[in-house]
């Protein structure tokens, strides 16, 4: 095989390579055996046409396309490897010559991975807003949330205050005309919860059961229903019941009701503190990692990012997201319907930071290469086991979905992230 590469622009060029006769002849034989199954000729049964008869009738050239399709992928990969090119997109292939008895000449327009010139990526000084410290107030707040979850609603005769729950009927209208979705019966509404549009709940504070109130509000300009956005509306609202939230005493009995594994309130506080410390430790480490990687990327120099890489990253991110949705039993159609968004909205969301994600991956890959990181067999097996556990799959299923090269790449990337993060110093 002869190969050459002609640079056309930054990160773009043309690979020229030949496919030799020792590869072409077996491919032609294979192509003939495939197509002859459906061919007939006078004096021969279907599928038994001799090669000489085929060549006389159709010409050997009729097999070229089928033969090329079978050998082109491997030939292209061999050429790229020989030229030591790091290609990032599918090539645009063109056949230059396919003459009988001669080597075939092929060209492929390719986009190559940008060159990354690493700056400092070790011992970086970073600052993060997250704190690992857990305060008494945070522990108390967590217990208070659980305490409120155990609260009971008790009927009251007094006027409603914020935090009370009212049971109401309501009928909404704009300019005296009722609108779809503006009516409800025996609806339970916690005042101050923000369930309804701004101003609605405030006008029920101070009211008692049995009262009927005209609640005047204005729909937000960005309201989901365009027909109502920005318009004034009146809701005739009848209050049937007012209920106060009665929370249990903050004592050892409450602690046992919240968590059967503890006996006292102090034990519950200690357990919650430990849980919060673990959560904040993770958040802190994630913040340090993000800050360190961002700085390593900022310190690096990347020569012109190809648009194709950004496009591919958007596609990858969208497919990954929708795949996660499907694993939760939510189809793409259902997701867009539930969120009131479109595929184009999702695309724009991922396009917003695709450039950053691609640059980040390139820098991490460059660090892995600079450090000479590789994956051992033991590390590959552990990665497969971890993925199988995470996605509730059999190890063999993971092996069938991920190639060894992909696993090795992911492990090397993790090592690179660790070398950036572990050496970082927080200001």
Curated annotation (Swiss-Prot):
Q: Any idea of its EC number?
A: 5.2.1.8
Q: Which family does it belong to?
A: Belongs to the FKBP-type PPIase family. Tig subfamily.
Location in the cell reads: Cytoplasm
Choose any GO biological process term that the UniProt entry carries and state it.
protein transport
Task: Show the catalytic activity.
Answer: [protein]-peptidylproline (omega=180) = [protein]-peptidylproline (omega=0)
Q: Which Pfam families match?
A: FKBP_C (PF00254), Trigger_C (PF05698), Trigger_N (PF05697)
Predominant subcellular localization, coarse grouping:
cytoplasm
Q: Which organism is it from?
A: Streptococcus mutans serotype c (strain ATCC 700610 / UA159)
Q: Where is the PPIase FKBP-type domain?
A: 163-248
Put simply, this protein is called Trigger factor
Which InterPro entries does the record cross-reference, listed alphabetically?
Answer: PPIase_dom_sf, PPIase_FKBP_dom, Trig_fac, Trigger_fac_C, Trigger_fac_C_sf, Trigger_fac_ribosome-bd_bac, Trigger_fac_ribosome-bd_sf, Trigger_fact/SurA_dom_sf
Q: What is known of its domains?
A: Consists of 3 domains; the N-terminus binds the ribosome, the middle domain has PPIase activity, while the C-terminus has intrinsic chaperone activity on its own.
Q: Which NCBIfam families match?
A: tig
Function in brief:
Involved in protein export. Acts as a chaperone by maintaining the newly synthesized protein in an open conformation. Functions as a peptidyl-prolyl cis-trans isomerase.
